[in-house]
Amino acid sequence: HPGSASPATTTLPNMNLAAWEALAEAGDVINGNYAPADGATLGPKKIIGNLTLGNGVDVTVTGVIWVLGNITTKQTSSLTVDPVFGANSTWIIADDPADQATKGKITIENGTTISGSGHLQSHLWFISTNTSTDEASPAITVDNTAYGAIFSAHNGVVRLKNNANVKAVTGKRLYLDQNAEVNYETSEFIDSNFSGSPSGSWGIKSETWQEIP
């Protein structure tokens, strides 16, 4: 908030990408670019290509999604965590280990709706491993309010464009356009669980990612 003291710097938490990507790969593998149909369910899934949500396409996320390309959501599309997740959350990962310089970008266009399962502590966590720190070509671009989303780009820049408003964001750099906001609701992240499926979960504990049996 304006006029308040700057928070102390802290080390970004480690992310167990290998384990989370293994969960996605264990579900199913799609070779090539993928554009789901309206009303589709998606996950756990590994996509060897780009993932694009077209205009007006609504998708229910049913597990971890790992994309070895770029992720783009078009206007009036939506991503919603399956209600059966309850208080659990899950991941959408953009990561090509062989090309993190040009691939692994995430673009959330204006008009996209991102929601958890309907439970206060349910979120959709977007992770980019792209290494761009240039705000003109960011690792993650968010051009819309995304109350149910967390965005992470620990090796790149996250750009929040005009009027973007997100739940939480972490990155090597954060670039905010005019009227963009980050509103941390601490109570919603205490003991939050992230799941590859509704039956298994990971928890946030003291700034580390810890598996919970």
Where are these regions (language model features)?
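Short, low-complexity, Pro/Ser/Thr/Gly-rich segments in the mature regions of secreted, periplasmic
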Residues: P198-P213
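Long, polar low-complexity repeats
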Residues: E21-Y184
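Low-complexity, intrinsically disordered Gly/Pro/Thr-rich segments
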Residues: N179-G200
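Beta-strand-rich assembly/attachment modules of structural machines
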Residues: H1-A35
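Intrinsically disordered, low-complexity regions enriched in Ser/Pro/Gly/Gln/His and often acidic
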Residues: L12-N14, V84, G118-H119, S195, ...
